[in-house]
Amino acid sequence: MTMNSSIIKNEQAYLDLLRLVLNEGTEKGDRTGTGTLSHFGAQLRFNLADGFPLLTTKKVHLKSITYELLWFLNGSTHVDYLQQNGVRIWNEWATSEQTARFNRPAGDLGPIYGHQWRNYGATTTADGQYNSDGVDQIAQVVEQIKTNPNSRRLIVSGWNPGEADQVALPPCHTLFQFFVADNKLSCQLYQRSADLFLGVPFNIASYAMLTHMVAQVCNLEVGEFIWTGGDCHIYQNHREQVELQLTRSLYTLPTLALNPNVKDIFAFNYEDISVDGYESHPAIKAQVAV
């Protein structure tokens, strides 16, 4: 596969990208000391009418994806909400050793995704906390989709260069843009750093879920989710897992169901979101690089 070949959509495109990076990626060092095979610049397209893009070639933990997205939308940056709901995906970055790097207590991840989405550019208090005087980008973009759907400014940015060194992990999925055409809502994500085996399957499902949620509250149908990656990499200690995944056949994608009574993007609860018909191969364990 080359990156300018004919467009292949949905999960097969993801598998083709894994194969490309595994076979042709450049060996590079990285911040974690693990080492990667890397490829710069890739795009995957998922037609959301074909199903919900939750990978079937390995089981993906939907509960973690759903709670994390609700956590982002709530504007929270502390892991207590996740941990109370049995989600551990941020634990490695929430230790006292990690948070001491930017002078915060254990569990406080700093101004990461939720803060940037809901309170971008907020001023700080004397104790280093944030006032509620920033830009609520989510509320703003939903209102713009409703009132000015032809706008080319339907953008949310998680990347704040002035705060990128004040967080447990600078945002990997940095910016997303919505697009409305023919009464359908599409979303494109730009991900600066893409851990193809562990992280990207979560990111694809999370932003596809968000697209469904925003579409519902804006009375639109869903169109495409488009994932665009910058540094697309496979960690050296994930190579065997990737090779195993590439031996597996595809199942039909499941469908996402939302409680149709929810009309406010901030009113969704975990129980309002479900996936039907998810059939997959078993999970494949791998170590996260911190």
From Swiss-Prot:
Has keyword Methyltransferase?
A: yes
Q: Which CDD domains does this one have? A: TS_Pyrimidine_HMase (cd00351)
Annotated Gene Ontology MF terms?
thymidylate synthase activity
Recorded catalytic reaction(s): these are:
dUMP + (6R)-5,10-methylene-5,6,7,8-tetrahydrofolate = 7,8-dihydrofolate + dTMP
Residues involved in (6R)-5,10-methylene-5,6,7,8-tetrahydrofolate binding = H61, D195, A289
* Enzymatic class: transferase
**Catalytic machinery residues:** C172 (nucleophile)
- Gene Ontology cellular-component terms listed: cytosol
Q: Where does it reside?
A: Cytoplasm
Q: In which pathway does it act?
A: Pyrimidine metabolism; dTTP biosynthesis
Its Enzyme Commission number? Answer: 2.1.1.45
- Function of this protein? Catalyzes the reductive methylation of 2'-deoxyuridine-5'-monophosphate (dUMP) to 2'-deoxythymidine-5'-monophosphate (dTMP) while utilizing 5,10-methylenetetrahydrofolate (mTHF) as the methyl donor and reductant in the reaction, yielding dihydrofolate (DHF) as a by-product. This enzymatic reaction provides an intracellular de novo source of dTMP, an essential precursor for DNA biosynthesis.
Assembly with partners or alone: Homodimer.
Output this protein's name: Thymidylate synthase
Originating species: Psychrobacter cryohalolentis (strain ATCC BAA-1226 / DSM 17306 / VKM B-2378 / K5)
Task: Provide the organism lineage as a comma list.
Answer: Bacteria, Pseudomonadati, Pseudomonadota, Gammaproteobacteria, Moraxellales
Q: Which gene encodes it?
A: thyA
